[in-house]
């Protein structure tokens, strides 16, 4: 659905080192999601490469490209927030009624947390909401003992950026990217054995916040619902004709296949009760995404609920056009891998009873 001008536009931040697979992931997301997304690409050194890869994939009509793909090539995004990032975001938000969301692809050197914190600036915090930070790691490089496939190229990228004001070593940057993640995607998983994938998942999980999952990925194939805090639009809304169906159908052992569980509760709940209950539900069952709404006593607007990994956000949606039902209640959809549906339902009901 097209986002109402007064509502907050969902933002997904994608981070990871040079060559990890961020642009491949974005191309697949843009081609397969059916959403009207704007992309902010931060790159330097090999100026324009990532932006050109995204522009050339045919995800939108050519006349819309300048308004849908914005490149920042003047340095590390987290170091140029005030001078570069905020003006571009304000420019994109002038077109918020034409967009379903924004994806920010950081350079390999950006610290994710300063960027996320920038969305709290008064100029944009009432117009956007960060639905998740997705960190892409190179599974093949990690299995070979390095956090990046080409350390020399990454060091050259560091040397080419005069605006860089943090001197963290590569391993520390990797730790920062993992520490900020709500979801970690392991690229090039099709080059690894199942045993190697499991070993890397176990190794990385020790560096992550509780509840953050590590998923294998090949050629950027990940369900859009996992990355964007949005509902897929109806087919008759801003549908585009594209001749790239061949890009949509890669299937192999590392393609993410998710289970979904619908959760419903009729009765009285409160925002505080849900904010206390849902983080444990997410962590205990390894939920990757949780979304839905609740109608609460005395409230005319629904409480919208969105979570990516452990990042949970609940807010009353004054822009909702949904008609209020006659009774209070909760409607949720949980996404995850090999979900214990009955266990998820029982824990939710036990916490609400």
Q: What kind of feature is each model-predicted range?
A:
Residues 41, 137, 307-309, 336:
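Flexible glycine-/small-residue-rich
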Residues 2, 151-321, 325-330, 339-342, ...:
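C-terminal accessory "lid"/substrate-recognition subdomains
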């Amino acid at each position: 659905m097209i986002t109402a001008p007064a509502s907050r536009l969902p933002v997904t931040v994608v981070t990871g080192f040079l060559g990890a697979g961020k642009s491949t992931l974005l191309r697949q997301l843009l081609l397969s999601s059916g959403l009207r997304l704007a992309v902010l690409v931060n790159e330097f050194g090999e100026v324009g490469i990532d932006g050109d890869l995204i522009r050339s994939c045919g995800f939108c009509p050519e006349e819309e490209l300048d308004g849908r793909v914005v490149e920042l090539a003047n340095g590390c995004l987290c170091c140029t927030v005030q001078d570069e990032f905020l003006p571009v975001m304000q420019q994109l938000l002038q077109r918020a009624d034409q967009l379903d969301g924004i994806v920010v692809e950081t350079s390999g050197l950006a610290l994710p947390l300063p960027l996320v914190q920038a969305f709290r600036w008064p100029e944009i915090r009432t117009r956007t909401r960060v639905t998740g930070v997705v960190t892409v790691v190179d599974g093949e490089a990690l299995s070979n003992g390095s956090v990046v496939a080409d350390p020399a190229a990454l060091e050259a990228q560091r040397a080419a950026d005069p605006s860089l004001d943090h001197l963290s070593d590569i391993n520390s940057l990797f730790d920062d990217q993992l520490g900020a993640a709500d979801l970690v995607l392991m690229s090039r998983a099709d080059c690894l054995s199942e045993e190697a994938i499991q070993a890397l998942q176990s190794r990385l999980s020790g560096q992550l916040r509780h509840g953050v999952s590590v998923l294998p990925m090949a050629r950027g194939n990940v369900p859009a619902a996992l990355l964007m805090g949005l509902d897929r639009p109806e087919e008759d809304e801003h549908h585009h004709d594209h001749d790239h169906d061949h890009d949509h159908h890669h299937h192999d052992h590392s393609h993410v296949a998710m289970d979904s569980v619908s959760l419903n509760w009729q009765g009285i709940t409160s925002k505080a009760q849900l904010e206390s209950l849902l983080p444990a539900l997410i962590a205990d069952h390894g939920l990757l995404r949780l979304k839905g709404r609740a109608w609460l006593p005395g409230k005319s607007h629904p409480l919208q609920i969105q979570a990516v990994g452990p990042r949970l956000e609940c807010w009353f949606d004054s822009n909702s056009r949904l008609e209020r039902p006659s009774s209070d209640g909760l409607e949720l959809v949980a996404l995850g891998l090999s979900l214990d549906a009955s266990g998820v339902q029982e824990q939710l009901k036990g916490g609400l009873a």
